[in-house]
């Protein structure tokens, strides 16, 4: 039997978690070692503090005062509407293109989610989204990166953050597809961390088996710790990478390594730049960027009443207009700063139903949505915004850049996303002088063209044929 360090027992006793050892004598040596390793990695005192705070009626932050203090973001680069605006965007694009040529850019894709909500029992990145082919989300992003490499004659490392649920299958999928010709040595898979679920009533850590804590991913804010623990921040520094283009797996129309966005980020020496789009209505379920007491923050839609969401400022502009696309550019040194003190990103509480093993060793599966049995903990990457000294917000072109796949049907579904990909393709063809019926699907690989100008030139030269689109 594996001897238990007295310090471990003391910590478990102090934090009311001694139940974690209830089946220890029944476990094999390897199972004992695994359980003790999980316990050793867990900050038991912090979890106890968070649970106690979650049981208080009041919030540690005065939510009402926070919303009242919110203002429309002040430092925003809006979409161009004048010749001067267009010139500014052109100059930013040139700066961004130079950053790409100099090899200072890498891509981070957050790919920890399964496609369950789409009726797809695999990592969401493997979901086929091409309007005419079975091109997957992973393939679309890989082809964008490869096309950027070819255009700017540069290296662009691709960092893919997986979860325990998606890591193995993602690795196998990329290997089977030869990393879409990017080269295995430039694609880095790394796994986000996990945190235990707590019993909502008692604060006790739940167990999923006799030897395992009930763990769940630690949220996209776990990116910072995951990059550091995988040694990737050091690797990026060695390769002189300065800018990390961050996006989530579910948006096939994101413009990866967007030169204009990179250019504005570099010009302003921003530590954290965020792409936003104007909400379609105050009721749209999107987090929004705002200024609160001189800092950039995100207010989640769930924090706002319908009346607050529709509030306008003195100019008649919605205060809460700037919808978060989850497209960011991080300064690498800023991520290193965050990694040096992980406590800067707070843990958030979500009440969920979580299956667990009870004191008799039987599995219980709660299913009362009105009274969730557990507390899950996660970090949000956008909590880095108020920590940064220099932030920037850039308004994107919503119809071009933000068409996510989140739901099985209706808004933000595979149907709407494929329709957007086809529409963008038809618009590019129209710019090249080819009219395509609105009901005809079009699919343009990034390797055929990254934008309308490139498509026009390649159709004219014969490098791309209309029949191939």
Where do the model's predicted regions map?
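Generic detection of intrinsically disordered/low-complexity segments and helix-coil linkers/edges
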Residues: 17-18, 250, 396
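Short, flexible, glycine/charge-rich loop motifs used to bind or transfer phosphoryl groups or to couple energy/partner
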Residues: 96-98, 234-235, 263, 318
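N-terminal glycine-rich phosphate-binding loop and ensuing alpha1 helix
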Residues: 3-188, 196, 207-225, 229-233, ...
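Conserved beta-loop-beta/alpha segment of the NTase-like Rossmann-fold superfamily
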Residues: 184-284
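Residues immediately flanking
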Residues: 111-112, 249, 332
